[in-house]
């Protein structure tokens, strides 16, 4: 695949993973999302020049997601559908989604360009809550806290998580 089509294919692939995770969870299934994320990550890594360094960024994304989503659950702001392996921790499908999101970090960094931290913070603050809103509409999660507080918490998590993951990946590559 030529370089100019890779970001489009990556974006489309991630959207497919997101949709598979959300729709699968809404039906009470973790497996479709986990499998889709695994296939997406595997395909993306097969096209990378140094897949081992990308794996670290992907794992970091999964760890951040596990902590963030578990915190939202413990704070009783969000309840996820298909809560496996525990109803108190982030489910497998949402962690798989965060792992797949880690694949998109290099493209996102190049698209944001200069002032990466500020732009990523703004993108996270806006796009994070929109994704949760869409997921809730599909039945993948339920907002259990007050809507303004829950969306503010999600916006703040993403406003910190996205720039942090991009900075981590940048520093890893130096």
Spell out what each predicted region is.
Residues 1-174:
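Aromatic-rich, lipid-facing transmembrane alpha helices and their immediate juxtamembrane interface loops
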């Amino acid at each position: 695949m030529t370089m100019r089509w890779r970001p489009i294919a990556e974006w489309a692939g991630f959207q497919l993973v997101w949709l598979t995770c959300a729709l699968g969870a809404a039906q009470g299934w973790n497996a479709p999302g986990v499998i889709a994320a695994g296939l997406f990550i595997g395909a993306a890594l097969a096209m990378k020049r140094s897949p081992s360094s990308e794996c670290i960024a992907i794992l970091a994304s999964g760890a951040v997601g596990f902590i963030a989503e578990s915190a939202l659950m413990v704070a009783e702001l969000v309840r996820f559908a298909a809560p496996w392996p525990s109803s108190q921790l982030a489910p497998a499908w949402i962690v798989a989604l965060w792992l797949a999101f880690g694949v998109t970090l290099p493209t996102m960094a190049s698209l944001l360009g200069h002032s990466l931290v500020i732009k990523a913070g703004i993108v996270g603050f806006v796009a994070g809550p929109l994704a949760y809103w869409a997921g809730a509409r599909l039945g993948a999660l339920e907002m259990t806290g007050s809507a303004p507080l829950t969306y503010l918490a999600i916006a703040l998590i993403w406003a910190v998580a996205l720039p942090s993951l991009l900075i981590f990946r940048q520093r890893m590559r130096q």
